Structures are given as structure tokens and as C-alpha cells.
């Protein structure tokens, strides 16, 4: 008997029906370089979700599909999970879990910093998520406090790594040859090409 492997991406539907048939879109939660994120309520279950809306262009379709593929592959408690994807003539809609605690950057700013214990709690989760993605040959390439969301507003400091748009899948021993990410956060050795 052959081993049976369950592949998570087989359970992430990619639909070409209108998102409005299944979700009521609400307020805008944030914007980025390539799109916006809005609150959404699933009509049948009343569960709240976040929807990343990305405009289709010739230049970015493959980039969006790569991000969808990567997010469909990863399943880790500290990586934002997606549930389904919708596509219409002009946009892709990536439906994900909603993180209600805001960006790590804002939480650090509001608190005026973290205690060593709180910093260790966040770093342990961050490293766990990054190690998991690396074990799956996926490199995020844009880790920064703005791409780490707090799952909720409680003091447990549970984080989710988001925005895998710059991520890349690598084969064993393959090296990256391009510089991606947010310039302000890029390590000097990456800028030098080391």
C-alpha cells in the first residue's frame, strides 16, 4: 500500500464566482503597495475574515499566483492561514484568518518597547514560523514588524507572519540572486551581494 499524503493546497478552493455571493465586504483594514485588505463576513457562517484584494495586471498575475501557492502550502500556527481564493475579471481575493491585534510595529510603539520576556515570546514564534517555511524551501524575504500581526489584543502576544508576496521557493543549496523586500529593513550583506 502506498503512503497517502494530504496536501493542504488541495483544500484551498480557487473560485471564479463573485466573492459577494459568499462574503459581505466591510471596512478597509489596511493598504499595501499592490492592494488593500478589507474585513469580510462569511454569509453562511457569520465568521469574520480578512480579504486581501489584489488588482490583476499583466506584470503581477504570476507574482500573485506564486503568493497564493505559497500560502496554500504553509500550515503553521504563526503563519497567517488562507481559506479560499476568488478571482474575477479585475482582481484576486485572498480570504484569510482575521488578526485583530494590529501590526507588531504598532504594538511595540504603543508599549514603548517590550520586556525581555515579551520579546523572547515574540521571537520564539517568529523563528518557529521562519524555520517551518525554510524546512519547506520557502524564504519570506520581507520580514519586518509591519508584516507580523498580533492574533488578538490579549497579552499572550500570539503572532502571525503575513505578506508572502516577496517569498520565493528555493531548491536545496540554491542561492537567491535578486534583492527583494523593504529597503529600510534589508540587511547590509544583502545589499552588498554577499
Name each region found by the language model.
Residues 48, 53-75:
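Conserved N-lobe beta3->alphaC-helix segment of eukaryotic protein kinase catalytic domains
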Residues 177-190:
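Conserved activation segment of eukaryotic-like protein kinases, specifically the C-terminal portion
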Residues 122-123:
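Activation segment signature within eukaryotic-like protein kinase domains
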Residues 89-103, 107:
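Conserved short submotifs of the Hanks-type protein kinase catalytic core
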Residues 84-85:
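A short, aromatic-enriched beta-strand patch in the conserved N-lobe beta-sheet
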Residues 26-33, 37:
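Protein kinase glycine-rich loop
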Residues 128-138:
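Protein kinase catalytic-loop region centered on the HRD/HxD motif
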